[in-house]
């Protein structure tokens, strides 16, 4: 195994993410795993993802662990995702904006939109698509997607870069999976108003 950890970011990474990443890097070093880290910044996330994918292919990495810079994850994330033996496997995480829906999708249809998972099986399960906050891909998958599309992450007319990749992969016959034992936090910035404090006091006094 030769692992590339790819982190696309706009301009900065969250401190809590850095703590999680540091623990993971120390664990990989202790276990003598051959790895490299690529933090790629830019205003267009899909281009950052493209550059990470190209490095993985050009430098002959076997896998890419994709981590967004606003994620919180456990130090065993890699071993749990690797245990699936799949070319594509994600952990579970939810959107950081109000509504907080799952970023794991049952279906993606241009005329209907996306259907999110509301509940999760207890074992590894197949999905239609997902966000790329905490995904492990094989370079074999990346090379096939790139070979047939001349891109991995360029957005499609109705799909962002992460779901567009998922569609390209499934169109080639690859199956996408989710490992429910990997649950990540999604760091959000929620404005707090005085009424939020009042609502909180009511919950602790009820």
Where are these regions (language model features)?
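N-proximal low-complexity "stem/linker" segments adjacent to membrane-targeting elements
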Residues: 1-43, 47
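Residue-level recognition of beta-strand->loop/alpha-helix junctions
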Residues: 38-41, 92, 180
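Active-site nucleotide-sugar/metal-binding loop of Leloir-type enzymes
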Residues: 50-63
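Conserved catalytic core of nucleotide-sugar-dependent glycosyltransferases
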Residues: 53, 74-154
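Short beta-strand-to-loop acidic/aromatic patch adjacent to the donor-nucleotide binding site
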Residues: 60-72
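C-terminal catalytic/acceptor-binding lobe
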Residues: 144-206
């Amino acid at each position: 195994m030769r692992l590339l950890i790819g982190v696309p970011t706009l301009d900065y990474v969250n401190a809590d993410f850095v703590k999680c990443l540091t623990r993971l890097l120390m664990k990989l070093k202790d276990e003598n795993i051959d790895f490299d880290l690529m933090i790629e910044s830019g205003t267009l996330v899909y281009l950052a993802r493209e550059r990470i994918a190209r490095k993985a292919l050009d430098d002959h990495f076997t896998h890419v662990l994709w981590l967004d810079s606003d994620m919180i994850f456990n130090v065993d994330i890699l071993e749990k995702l690797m245990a699936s033996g799949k070319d594509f496997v994600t952990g579970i995480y939810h959107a950081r904006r109000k509504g907080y829906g799952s970023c794991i999708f049952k279906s993606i249809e241009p005329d209907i939109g996306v259907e999110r998972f509301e509940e999760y099986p207890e074992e590894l399960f197949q999905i239609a698509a997902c966000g790329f906050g905490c995904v492990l891909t094989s370079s074999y998958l990346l090379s096939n997607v790139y070979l047939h599309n001349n891109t991995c992450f360029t957005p499609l007319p109705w799909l962002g870069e992460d779901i567009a990749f998922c569609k390209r992969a499934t169109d080639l016959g690859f199956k996408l999976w989710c490992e429910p034992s990997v649950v990540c936090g999604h760091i959000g910035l929620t404005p707090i108003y005085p009424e939020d404090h009042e609502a909180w006091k009511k919950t602790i006094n009820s």
